[in-house]
Amino acid sequence: MKYNIVFKFNVEGIVDKPDVIGAIFGQTENLFGDDFDLRELQDKGRLGRISVDLSTSKGRSEGTIIIPSNLDKVETALVAAMIENVDKVGPYNAEFKLIDIVDIREEKIKKIIGRAKEILGSWSREKTLDIREVINEITSSVKTGELTEYGPERLPAGPDVDKDPELIIVEGRADVINLLRYGYKNVIAVEGATGKIPQTLVDLTKQKKAVIAFLDGDHGGDLILKELLSSNIKLDYVARAPTGKEVEELTGKEIAKSLSNMVTIAQYIKKQQEAQQAIKQALATETTTTAVTTTSTQIQVEVKPEEKKEIQITVPAQIIEEIKKLPGTLEGILLDENWNIIEKIQVRDIVQKLENISADSIRYIVFDGVITQRLVDLASAKNIKMLIGARIGGINRRPKELELLSFNDIIS
């Protein structure tokens, strides 16, 4: 069957289900010839069994009727109109009213879409081989884990942080949610630690065979790693997101690749020292060259501080309430000039949305994610006035006409 035709009916008297069904057959018989007679259509399998749900009260009868249809849309609509034309059940006046025509195939479509998502999830998850087998267990399942809170500090974590011999440390709640989406359940967040790593996390790492710090590929990730290295936490490996990217926005393939490219702490520190030494040598060479070419003439230039345009935008109370609901959802809200909600959208779709809109059509964006340089540049090009995100990443170019705020600026 393709459709369910749903009616409501009222009868000005007490009747039974067979009376209702008989009235439908009797008053529609031969209206459009034998080929479109309801009994004939049932015999041919074009219509299903008529289902009647009936109740009586105060001398009246009312209820609903469902008729399955395997006809096309035009024929199904014609059947519906025929039944609405029924005005008697037995000796009593009656009214039949169409409520809905339900497409039964929608349920099948939903099941197909659900299965397609499962297939895509297992396909997207890249399986990697690693001789250290540090990520062997966390790549064995594609089922999204349940977000939990760990310890008295209520650190966002996956369900396997206690029982798995390996542990992945990330920065924030959104990072944990993204890794859970791709099946990594032994993950825990430091929640933007500022100067002190939670003692719960310190104690947890000492119980683990291997501990991996998996951090953003920006300056914020550098700061978190510096805090981890300066604490007494047990840390064995470092993995970084691609340069300029956040862990929370990585795909399953990018996550697997980043983890497979992790290095030991000793290797990481050595690379950092080599990079710093190269910078020092470059600066020393530049200083020497400058000293040789500089003349005795000195020019003094008065440098005036850059004038910064002040932007004062008041966030309405109803939008602040919406912001309070966003943490952990990975969702965003697009708003117009008057702070009216235009659309609610997944964070991962915001950049693509902005690329396809005209300038001035969106004026404010609130979202549960990191404000990146790419998003700032795109928002500026579209004349957006304000970005409000869960966190502000490393921004090198900040347009004067665009205001950037974090959730903490709004709801702290």
Swiss-Prot record:
<dbReference type="GO" id="GO:1990077">
    <property type="term" value="C:primosome complex"/>
</dbReference>
<keyword id="KW-0479">Metal-binding</keyword>
<dbReference type="GO" id="GO:0046872">
    <property type="term" value="F:metal ion binding"/>
</dbReference>
<protein>
    <recommendedName>
        <fullName>DNA primase DnaG</fullName>
        <ecNumber>2.7.7.101</ecNumber>
    </recommendedName>
</protein>
<feature type="binding site">
    <location>
        <position position="216"/>
    </location>
    <ligand>
        <name>Mg(2+) 1</name>
    </ligand>
</feature>
<dbReference type="InterPro" id="IPR034154">
    <property type="entry name" value="TOPRIM_DnaG/twinkle"/>
</dbReference>
<keyword id="KW-0460">Magnesium</keyword>
<comment type="function">
    <text>RNA polymerase that catalyzes the synthesis of short RNA molecules used as primers for DNA polymerase during DNA replication. Also part of the exosome, which is a complex involved in RNA degradation. Acts as a poly(A)-binding protein that enhances the interaction between heteromeric, adenine-rich transcripts and the exosome.</text>
</comment>
<keyword id="KW-0808">Transferase</keyword>
<dbReference type="Pfam" id="PF13662">
    <property type="entry name" value="Toprim_4"/>
</dbReference>
<feature type="binding site">
    <location>
        <position position="171"/>
    </location>
    <ligand>
        <name>Mg(2+) 1</name>
    </ligand>
</feature>
<comment type="subunit">
    <text>Forms a ternary complex with MCM helicase and DNA. Component of the archaeal exosome complex.</text>
</comment>
<dbReference type="GO" id="GO:0005737">
    <property type="term" value="C:cytoplasm"/>
</dbReference>
<comment type="similarity">
    <text>Belongs to the archaeal DnaG primase family.</text>
</comment>
<feature type="domain" description="Toprim">
    <location>
        <begin position="165"/>
        <end position="243"/>
    </location>
</feature>
<keyword id="KW-0235">DNA replication</keyword>
<keyword id="KW-0240">DNA-directed RNA polymerase</keyword>
<keyword id="KW-0271">Exosome</keyword>
<dbReference type="GO" id="GO:0000178">
    <property type="term" value="C:exosome (RNase complex)"/>
</dbReference>
<dbReference type="InterPro" id="IPR006171">
    <property type="entry name" value="TOPRIM_dom"/>
</dbReference>
<dbReference type="InterPro" id="IPR020607">
    <property type="entry name" value="Primase_DnaG_arc"/>
</dbReference>
<dbReference type="GO" id="GO:0006269">
    <property type="term" value="P:DNA replication, synthesis of primer"/>
</dbReference>
<feature type="binding site">
    <location>
        <position position="216"/>
    </location>
    <ligand>
        <name>Mg(2+) 2</name>
    </ligand>
</feature>
<dbReference type="GO" id="GO:0000428">
    <property type="term" value="C:DNA-directed RNA polymerase complex"/>
</dbReference>
<keyword id="KW-0548">Nucleotidyltransferase</keyword>
<dbReference type="InterPro" id="IPR050219">
    <property type="entry name" value="DnaG_primase"/>
</dbReference>
<dbReference type="GO" id="GO:0003899">
    <property type="term" value="F:DNA-directed RNA polymerase activity"/>
</dbReference>
<keyword id="KW-0804">Transcription</keyword>
<feature type="binding site">
    <location>
        <position position="218"/>
    </location>
    <ligand>
        <name>Mg(2+) 2</name>
    </ligand>
</feature>
<dbReference type="GO" id="GO:0008143">
    <property type="term" value="F:poly(A) binding"/>
</dbReference>
<keyword id="KW-0639">Primosome</keyword>
